[in-house]
Each structure stands twice: as C-alpha cells, then as structure tokens.
Amino acid sequence: KLMEDIYDRCQVLVLDAEGLQADRHAIKIVENNMEEDIDLILAVGAGTIHDISRYIAHNYKVPFISVPTAASGDGFVTTVAAMTLDGVKKTVPSVAPICVYADTDIFSKAPQRLTAAGISDLMAKYICLADWKIANLVTGEYFCCETVKLEEKALKTVKSSIQDITEGEEDECEQLMYALILSGLAMQMIGNSRPASCAEHQVTHLWDMEVINGPLDALHGEKVSVAALLVLEEYKRIAAAITQGRCHAKPYENEDEELL
C-alpha cells in the first residue's frame, strides 16, 4: 500500500532482466535515464537490483529503500555491493537501506527457482562461519560469538522448514526472508562480509569473471551452492591430510604468506 501511495511521485526505471548484471553497463543505463535531482532510490527487485541501487545511492549520496520481491539472497541490507568492474568482481563500499519493506504476499509467491537460490545462499553460511572461526584461530581475527549464535539459530530454523518454503508456505517463507536479512545485518554489525561470504563466494567471483568459463545462466545462490559443495570437498581433503600428518598450518606472520 505504501508503494502504491508514492508510485505516482516516482520516476520508474525498469531494467531488462535478460543478462542483467551489477556492472558498469547497468550503472550507465540507470545514470543516463534517471532524473538529476533524485533524493531517494527505491530498489524493487532481487539481489542484482539491490547491488545496482545501493552502489548508485552511495555515489550520489542519497538514501535508498529496499523492497525485495523474492527471498533470493542475503544482500538486501548490506553496506557493500558485489560489482563487476572492469572485468573484476569486487566488493565495494555502498550504503545500507534506511528501511526494508518485504511483503510476504509478494516474495512467498516468487518463482521457486529464486526462493531455492535464497535457501542455497543461506545454507552456504555454514562454510562462512567455519572459515571465520579458522581465521580467528590462525590469525587472531575478531570473531563474534553472539553474531554466530544468531546466524546458527536462523540457519537451523530454515533448514528444518525447507520443504514448506519450497511449497510457498507464508510463515516459513517469512523465516527465510528474516534469516537472509539477518545475514546482511551481521555484515553490518561486523563491518565486513566475513559472516556471510568466504571461500565459496570467492569461487563464484571467479565464475562471474569468466576466468576459465563462459557466461553462466545461473543465479547467484545457485552458483554459491555448487561452490560450497566444492569447498566442502576440498576442506575434507585438507582435514584428512592434516590428520595424517601430510600437511600442517604454519604460524601466521603476515597476510602475504601461504598458510598451508
């Protein structure tokens, strides 16, 4: 209802979803078509729309409001944007929304593929939290137990409701959206993306940059889920090698050194 009330007072830009990426091309399209005297940006859509919106809001020093239409990822309330700039995937400073309007009646009816991508993005947090703890043990990096507890509780709730979520049950879809927003808030609380993006996201960044592959017709959460499985297998291999005494962690001296 709020969006309907202000719709007539807004300039509306609809970006073609086909091949849309958070990159300079998309930024240029928006900048070439938006009015000069904007004082607020409404991001109505999923993850890519939000990355583009928060990046532009940061550059133009205006606030933005998040209106997620699908529970497809955890990037709705972060303070960084995942952008492909000059062929390189980067996490760049941006702004968090001043508020979020997530209508259950809308996002619970989103295409199942988008919702499944959100579940996948969330389940990869198990890898992120493990990575974070390892970094804490090896390098002394700050590790927030309270933040981890909040994320683990949300993960447990969603994990037990996956079937209901895929069937569009509103209460369970709300829990998924809550968990995704919480993941974004965790990044705000810590001041970086450590609680939500680690080894598995590094793999997806290489895919996004097409280092050894062509364009992929895959959603972010879909790529994250595959990457999480690949990372998990590699971690199992490393763990076995450590147990068997075939490799060990070196004392941490500086960030430029290889740790294994």
Put a short name on every predicted segment.
Residues N59-T157:
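A glycine/threonine-rich phosphate-anchoring loop and its flanking beta-alpha core
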Residues V148-L260:
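Active-site segments that bind and position negatively charged phosphate/pyrophosphate groups
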Residues K1-L40:
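ATP/NTP phosphate-donor binding region
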Residues V44, G73-V77, A218, E222:
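Active-site histidine-anchored catalytic micro-motif
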Residues M34-I56, Y60-T69:
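A short, small-residue-rich loop immediately preceding and capping a beta-strand
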